[in-house]
Regions:
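Hydrophobic alpha-helical segments typical of transmembrane helices
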Residues: 3, 15, 27-31, 39, ...
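Helix-terminus/linker motif at the lipid-water interface of multi-pass membrane proteins
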Residues: 23-41, 110-117, 173-184, 244-278, ...
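Short runs within selected transmembrane alpha-helices of multi-pass transporters and secretion channels
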Residues: 61, 130-149, 156-164, 189-204, ...
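N-terminal transmembrane alpha-helices
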Residues: 2-30, 34-35, 51-63, 67, ...
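Small-residue-rich hydrophobic transmembrane alpha-helices
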Residues: 40-100, 137-156, 254, 258, ...
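Short alpha-helical transmembrane segments in multi-pass integral membrane proteins
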Residues: 1-14, 68-135, 181-236, 294-359, ...
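Transmembrane helical elements of multi-pass membrane transporters/channels
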Residues: 9-25, 129, 163, 196-200, ...
Length: 442
């Protein structure tokens, strides 16, 4: 019972935090759409660039999460301080370089993306303000990862809740001119986003230095930092590559749908992706909690406990995934009907949701078990399998089933199922084989 309680103590705040980020994005776009449709489109395009840049920060953050969790388990305070100080400074420097790039070359990047002239004015304002302050986001990402890896997911969630409430309030003030404020539109949204992130970063630092690590930890920047830097990259780079591979594969599949199946299939895909995300949230939350638990247990040398904890967490996530899949099947037409009354889209979407119910358990395999392997420091095997399976199996069979065999969007989903289940079974064999035991870095 204690293990399960520990899982939910970690996973529930992560679930709420991730859900709030999702809802914040929806609220931003909704309020901007009331101001100007072009403003909503411009922010969407800018956020695509910013989202890709956040993957750069994820390299250091992923390494930080694993090393901090393992050293918390090992009770190695000196190494925790060393990792924290080096990762914070590294992501700050990287974030500063990215921010400068956005200020001076943001417009160029947007133009290369194909952002039209009518959207450019809004997009330019947004990317220069939010993109120009990305160094704040890079620091915030690192601090919250450190807090989470100590097991304080509730505190991380509360920081995020406060940031999101302030962000939405600021959006409303500057979009609708509340309390006599000027109507700034996109520029106001950008200011609200940046200010909320700055305040969240300050609060996160206060919690970090008050209860977890001392300010004096920065002395380790001068004490042989190269070894720690190498460890951060050794774990972080493969983890980021895996996410990049997935993102790129999904982009290619989106293009296959647009070019071969038409607009209605693409619209249906967008709605299905949004609906399935609510099921995936459970796996993501449990997966991230699993990484923290495995990191701390392996760091403490409790390998057998880590092994069984990983399997138990996987079974819990699988239960939620199966139940979520059943709900998608039962309510498929009503769920798609929330978004559209177009009967063709509802038909395509409802059929594909039936197929998606079989995809979600496969996705759970990968999300939970890969996070477990990552927590133990085993990061090369997942990224190698990701590249082989996503491209050799997922993309190719999605095209074959969906386009060549003429099965349409459900055929695309069948290809995704093959990828997720093949990789997932490989991850399960990897976990059961315990080769990850040799990858622990403390």
């Amino acid at each position: 019972m204690e293990k399960r309680k520990s899982l939910f103590q970690l996973a529930v705040p992560i679930f709420i935090e991730t859900l709030l980020f999702m809802l914040l994005g929806i609220a931003d776009i909704f309020m901007l759409s009331q101001f100007d449709d072009r403003a909503a489109g411009a922010v969407g395009a800018s956020n695509q660039v910013i989202g890709n840049l956040n993957l750069i920060f994820a390299i250091i953050s992923a390494g930080t999460a694993v090393l901090v969790a393992q050293n918390v388990g090992a009770k190695n305070k000196r190494e925790i301080e060393r990792v924290c100080s080096i990762s914070l400074v590294m992501n700050f420097v990287i974030g500063l370089l990215v921010s400068i790039t956005m200020i001076f070359f943001g417009d160029v990047i947007l133009t290369k993306m194909g952002v039209t002239r009518s959207l450019m004015g809004y997009a330019s304002n947004y990317i220069k303000i939010v993109g120009g302050a990305l160094f704040v986001q890079s620091i915030l990402n690192t601090v919250t990862v450190i807090i989470r890896s100590h097991g304080y997911t509730r505190e991380s969630m509360l920081i995020t809740v406060g940031m999101n409430i302030l962000n939405i309030f600021g959006d409303a003030v500057f979009i609708f001119g509340l309390f006599g404020a000027p109507v700034l539109g996109v520029k106001g949204v950008a200011i609200a986003t940046t200010v909320s992130r700055i305040l969240a970063t300050i609060i996160a630092f206060i919690f970090l230095f008050k209860g977890l690590v001392p300010v004096s930890m920065f002395k380790y920047l001068y004490d042989k930092p190269v070894g720690t830097f190498k460890k951060l990259i050794k774990i972080g780079f493969p983890s980021a590559m895996e996410n990049m591979s997935y993102s790129l594969a999904q982009t290619v599949i989106m293009s296959i749908i647009l070019l071969n199946l038409g607009e209605q299939a693409y619209i249906a895909r967008t709605y299905i992706w949004t609906l399935s995300w609510f099921v995936v949230l459970f796996s993501i939350s449990i997966g991230q909690a699993n990484q923290i638990m495995i990191g701390q247990l392996t760091g403490a040398g409790k390998v057998e406990e880590a092994y069984h904890t990983g399997l138990n967490n996987f079974k819990t996530a699988m239960l939620f995934s199966v139940l979520g899949g059943i709900a998608l099947i039962i309510f498929r037409r009503k769920l798609i009907g929330i978004y559209t009354d177009n009967q063709d889209i509802i038909l395509i979407g409802s059929i594909t949701l039936i197929v998606d119910a079989f995809l979600e358990p496969g996705r759970t395999f990968n999300i939970v078990l890969i996070n477990g392997l990552r927590g133990a420091g085993d990061v090369i095997f997942p990224v190698v399998m990701a590249i082989i399976s996503m491209w050799g199996l997922g993309v190719t069979t999605a095209y074959y089933f969906g386009v060549v065999l003429g099965l349409g969007l459900p055929g695309i989903w069948m290809g995704l199922i093959l990828d997720e289940w093949f990789r997932g079974v490989c991850m399960l064999f990897r976990w059961r084989g315990k080769k990850w035991v040799r990858k622990v870095m403390v």
